């Protein structure tokens, strides 16, 4: 039935959004459903042919005017719904890629050690190109006149100045205003949030 494939994409987007929210953004982006998208585009192409046929038959007076208008209108609605489903799916994945780029401080994620081969395989070729160019834009922006401003910092002011954190993976020593911390997996620290916010975003630390 027309629209079933688009509905699958929407459900997949909802699952991805919920998973991403629950895991505090520390999750792999699911595989890009290229086959479903290709079939949706094929479906849209068939629907367009149907609209052209219905319009032609209506102009020739070979179909009942009310029936033809109803068929034509429903077919257009199916095309529009498929378009909205595709855009919603692509927009969600693009927003997640943007967030990943900012969380990595604008560094090239495709060559980052935190970006696994599975992460790369889950992206379409166009998404890989988009992510690389978006990271380049962030790098250029932060190396210009705004180099002294932390553009990747959170827009929400912290509720606590100092927080307890747990180390999720080894990160070595970090120098802060209050001393040096050796971040060893499973260790805990009471630190100033602004000093470790970047490490939290990158997945090295977890706020307790």
From Swiss-Prot:
GO terms for cellular component: CMG complex; DNA replication preinitiation complex; GINS complex; nuclear replication fork; nucleus. GO terms for biological process: DNA strand elongation involved in mitotic DNA replication; DNA-templated DNA replication; double-strand break repair via break-induced replication. PANTHER family: DNA REPLICATION COMPLEX GINS PROTEIN PSF1 (PTHR12914:SF2), PARTNER OF SLD5 (PTHR12914). It is found in: Nucleus. Present with 1431 molecules/cell in log phase SD medium. SUPFAM superfamilies: GINS helical bundle-like. It holds the Pfam family PSF1_C. InterPro entries: GINS_A, GINS_bundle-like_dom_sf, GINS_Psf1, PSF1_C. This is DNA replication complex GINS protein PSF1. Keywords: Cell cycle, DNA replication, Nucleus. Required for DNA replication. Functions as part of the GINS complex which plays an essential role in the initiation of DNA replication by binding to DNA replication origins and facilitating the assembly of the DNA replication machinery. Required for the chromatin binding of CDC45. Component of the GINS complex which is a heterotetramer of SLD5, PSF1, PSF2 and PSF3. Interacts with PSF2. Changing residue 84 to G: In PSF1-1; temperature-sensitive mutant. Defective in DNA replication. Impaired chromatin binding of CDC45. Belongs to the GINS1/PSF1 family.
């Amino acid at each position: 039935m027309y629209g079933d494939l688009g509905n699958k994409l929407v459900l997949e987007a909802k699952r991805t959004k919920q998973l991403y929210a629950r895991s505090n953004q520390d999750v792999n982006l699911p595989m890009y459903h290229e086959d479903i998208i290709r079939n949706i585009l094929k479906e849209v192409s068939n629907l367009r042919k149907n609209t052209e046929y219905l319009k032609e038959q209506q102009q020739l007076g070979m179909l009942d005017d009310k029936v033809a208008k109803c068929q034509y209108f429903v077919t257009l609605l199916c095309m529009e719904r498929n378009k909205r489903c595709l855009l919603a799916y692509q927009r969600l994945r693009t927003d997640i890629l943007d967030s990943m780029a900012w969380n990595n401080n604008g560094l090239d994620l495709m060559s980052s050690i935190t970006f696994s081969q599975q992460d790369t395989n889950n992206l379409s070729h166009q998404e890989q190109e988009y992510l690389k160019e978006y990271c380049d834009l962030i790098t250029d922006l932060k190396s210009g006149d705004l180099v002294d401003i932390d553009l990747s910092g959170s827009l929400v002011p912290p509720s606590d100045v100092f927080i307890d954190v747990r180390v999720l993976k080894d990160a070595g020593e970090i120098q802060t205003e209050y001393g040096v911390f050796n971040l060893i997996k499973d260790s805990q620290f009471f630190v100033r949030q602004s000093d470790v916010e970047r490490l939290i975003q990158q997945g090295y630390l977890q706020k307790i």
